[in-house]
UniProtKB/Swiss-Prot annotation:
Belongs to the BamA family. GO terms for cellular component: Bam protein complex. The gene is bamA. This is Outer membrane protein assembly factor BamA. InterPro entries: Bac_surfAg_D15, BamA/TamA_POTRA, D15-like, OM_assembly_BamA, POTRA. The keyword Transmembrane applies. NCBIfam families: OM_YaeT (TIGR03303), PRK11067.1 (NF008287). HAMAP family: OM_assembly_BamA. It comes from the Bacteria. Disulfide bonds: none annotated. Residues 1-20 form the signal peptide. GO terms for biological process: Gram-negative-bacterium-type cell outer membrane assembly; protein insertion into membrane. Residues 24-91, 92-172, 175-263, 266-344, 347-421 form the POTRA domain. Keywords: Cell outer membrane, Membrane, Repeat, Signal, Transmembrane, Transmembrane beta strand.
Length: 803
């Protein structure tokens, strides 16, 4: 066998054997050690081919090329006569990747980072990359204050040159901030400055934002907060000189020292605007007016820049540049602000596109647009389209993106990116509700029927006290101008006694149709007609019912029927930021009806609902919600409003913590009534001449309900589901009264039901979930102000409705 000459042993250890300037001609190339890599693939990666004349430099280039493929741990090139013998050791293939001990970082996030570094199942393992990954993960833990954390990559060999890769984490504990010192502050105390930080050395129990756990990113944010605090108060020369973060020997404590130079306070002497103002100098000048002697304020300067950009954006200048340069005069402690504006090009909208609307048709989204294709771009019109899409309630999120058209200097496309949510459900089953007992439900409710935007409902319910069925349809764009048309037909068999109301049975059916007329972006008027037939039976005489029957001329009736035609009207103001789980804005809804000639009854009824959401943070995760509900009705022409049209309160949609419909006036049964008027629910005759007091609610013709709610982020819920779950703490209050009540007509121990001051109150916590079955609402409330006859119900839940 001819002697083999070693040309190069490996990447790190090489011996350069010189074959002369002319080298030798390669007659053949052989490989040893290939397992996963094909011979053809290896040959293609080499710069040397059979028949080439090679020298030392060619051999070095060959080795580098083979290493560059990432498939080999070791490469040796040997010469056997005119044959090149390439000996390789392939890198092992990753068979599996597992993690152990990682609590702060999820597996999915780790896998994404590994894949970004080329480490994935089925790929070759580069051991040098593992060292970088270990160090990068440890640096991450250090940045969040876990200085004792360690990450080790454990590689376990398997047959056929495969390995298992396991990352073992020892996270340790987060270092806590022992003290934060600010050096150089004279105008403000250290306590005042630190009170605006997220990081704290002391955290009161009530502070849900402050944190003693050190995090590098939070410190950077706090330093920016400190800078803004001074700049907003005129300290134009303020500077953070240095920041020291010291670690205790046991790596469990942190000391932070921030060295600052406050400088003096400066006042604005004027604002000078220059540049390409695109003919809008007068409007821009209004945005830059300042009060004489006003302190320099960095936040106001930034807002002024943003306002100028928004102004130009409304006129089609999609990418304006606004830069403010303060000229500081140290002699008189003033700042002159020079604002340079470059409006840039004005843009047309070529196309409006929608992404993510797999169910909703483009036409449903497009009719909500206020920005038109082929027109000048208007940023305010684009934003209005986003608001209108959010208010539809079809989408979890709506985002906009203005994209330049390649090759065009003055055209853009506006893209609305939506994430659809479940807008309805098909259900058939048996359920249980705290207010309805065992119930059987079947139906379809779809707010975006087949993606057309139609709202269609086919529903049926049967429970302890009610059999109800309804078909409803609403076309929100009956005309191209946005006039809506809705209608429904229904049937209801209602056993009032089983619903904790006074004794009667009402079988009713009816229909109504309503037109909605948009007045502007936020206001809609509604008008319509309705018909309802009510057939009452099993009426046990009680005072409120008796008043109504007397006004109808049939005081002794135990059965009664009425056909009524109504004119229905309403007004809605809606400026909520989205249709479900809103976080900002207000909504006011006024509804009413009045009987028209041809009706057996003569009455009117009005109700008003309001809701206002006020976010208290920039991310709208913490929100204060205030709600009210008012109702009033009365008879006309000497008749009373029917008792079955009364208002009720109590339950998950009004005052939580009280049983449904139990707040307010109670039935006082007349002598001879056969009912469960006493507390043990045994049916017997009322024998008291003045009447028998009961706990059966009868409602009233007037109602007032209010609620104050604090919406918070839901614990243990990932960002993916944050828009589907809502947690809140609430305080509810409400009352129902009867303005026509005559205390002299009832026993002396019966309260005055005409008094609106009998207010009930409760407080508790609520959880709402937009589930695939529809909205699920859970609440736990404790009544802390109630009256005799009220029925408490701390835990309540409902399917399919929110307030």
């Amino acid at each position: 066998m001819a002697m083999k000459k070693l040309l190069i042993a490996s990447l790190l250890f090489s011996s350069a054997t010189v074959y002369g300037a002319e080298g030798f001609v390669v007659k053949d190339i052989h490989f040893e050690g290939l397992q996963r890599v094909a011979v053809g693939a290896a040959l293609l990666s080499m710069p040397v081919r059979t028949g080439d004349t090679v020298n030392d430099e060619d051999i070095s280039n060959t080795i580098r090329a083979l290493f560059a493929t990432g498939n080999f741990e070791d490469v040796r090139v040997l010469r056997d006569g005119n044959t090149l013998l390439v000996q390789v050791k392939e890198r092992p293939t990753i068979a599996s990747i597992t993690f152990s001990g990682n609590k702060s970082v999820k597996d999915d996030m780790l896998k994404q980072n590994l894949e970004a570094s080329g480490v994935r199942v089925g790929e070759s393992l580069d051991r040098t990359t593992l060292s970088d990954i270990e160090k990068g993960l440890e640096d991450f833990y250090y940045s969040v204050g876990k200085y004792s954390a360690s990450v080790k990559a454990v590689v376990t060999p398997l047959p056929r040159n495969r390995v298992d890769l396991k990352l073992v984490f020892q996270e340790g504990v987060s270092a806590k901030i022992q003290q934060i010192n600010i050096v150089g502050n004279h105008a403000f105390s250290t306590e005042e400055l630190i009170s605006h930080f997220q990081l704290r050395d002391e955290v009161p129990w009530w502070n849900v934002v402050g944190d003693r756990k050190y995090q590098k990113q939070k410190l950077a944010g706090d330093l920016e907060t400190l800078r803004s605090y001074y700049l907003d108060r005129g300290y134009a020369r303020f500077n953070i000189d240095s920041t020291q973060v010291s670690l205790t020997p046991d790596k469990k404590g942190i000391y932070i020292t921030v060295n600052i130079t406050e400088g003096d306070q400066y006042k604005l002497s004027g604002v000078q605007v220059s540049g390409n103002l695109a003919g809008h100098s007068a409007e821009i000048e209004k945005l830059t007016k300042i009060e004489p002697g006003e302190l320099y304020n960095g936040t106001k300067v930034t807002k002024m820049e943003d306002d100028i950009k928004k102004l130009l954006g409304r006129y089609g200048y999609a990418y304006p540049r606004v830069q403010s340069q303060p000229e500081i005069n140290d002699a008189d402690k003033t700042v002159k602000l020079r604002v340079n504006v470059d409006a840039g090009n004005r843009f047309y909208v070529r196309k409006i596109r929608f992404e993510g609307n797999d169910t909703s048709k483009d036409s449903v989204l497009r009719r909500e647009m206020r920005q038109m294709e082929g027109a000048w771009l208007g940023s305010d019109l684009v934003d209005q389209g986003k608001e209108r899409l959010n208010r539809l309630g079809f989408f979890e999120t709506v985002d906009t993106d203005t994209q330049r058209v390649p090759g065009s200097p003055d055209q853009v496309d506006v893209v609305y990116k939506v994430k659809e949510r479940n807008t309805g459900s098909f259900n058939f089953g048996i359920g249980y509700g705290t207010e309805s007992g065992v119930s059987f439900q079947a139906g379809v409710q779809q707010d975006n029927w087949l993606g057309t935007g139609y709202s269609v409902g086919i529903n049926g319910t049967k429970n302890d006290y009610q059999t109800y069925s309804e078909l409803s349809v609403t076309n929100p764009y009956f005309t191209v101008d946005g006039v809506s048309l809705g209608g429904r037909i229904f049937y209801n068999d209602f056993e009032a006694d089983d619903a904790d109301l006074s004794d009667y049975t009402n079988k009713s059916y009816g229909t109504d149709v309503t037109l909605g007329f948009p007045i502007n972006e936020y206001n809609t008027l509604r008008a319509g007609l309705g018909y309802v037939h009510n057939k009452l039976s099993n009426m046990q005489p009680q005072i409120a019912m008796d008043r109504y029957l007397e006004s109808m001329g049939d005081p002794d009736a135990s059965d009664f029927a009425a056909d009524d035609f109504t004119f229905n009207y309403g007004w809605t103001y809606n400026k909520l930021d989205r249709g479900y789980f809103p976080t900002d804005g207000s909504r006011v809804n006024l509804t009413g009806k009045v009987t028209i000639p041809g009706s057996d009854n003569e009455y009117y009824k009005v109700s008003l609902d309001t809701a206002t959401y006020v976010p208290i943070d920039n991310d709208h995760k913490w929100v204060v919600l205030g709600r009210t509900r008012w109702g009033y009705g009365d008879g006309l022409g000497g008749k009373e409003m029917p008792f079955y049209e009364n208002f009720y309160a109590g339950g998950s949609s009004t005052v939580r913590g009280f049983q449904s419909n139990t707040i307010g006036p109670k039935a006082v049964y007349k002598n001879g009534a056969h009912t469960s008027w006493d507390d043990d629910d045994d049916y017997e005759d009322c024998t008291q001449e003045s009447g028998c007091k009961s706990d059966d609610a009868v409602g009233g013709n007037a109602m007032a309900v209010a609620s104050l709610e604090f919406i918070t982020p839901t614990p243990f819920i990932s960002e993916k589901y944050a828009n589907s779950v809502r947690t809140s703490f609430f305080w509810d209050m409400g009352t129902v009264w009867d303005t026509n009540w005559d205390p002299s007509s009832a026993p002396s121990d019966v309260p005055d039901y005409s008094d609106p001051g009998n207010i009930r109150m409760s407080a508790g916590i609520a959880l709402q979930w937009m589930s695939p079955l529809g909205p699920l609402v859970f609440s736990y409330a404790q009544p802390f102000k109630k009256y005799d006859g009220d029925k408490a119900e701390q835990f309540q839940f409902n399917i399919g409705k929110t307030w």
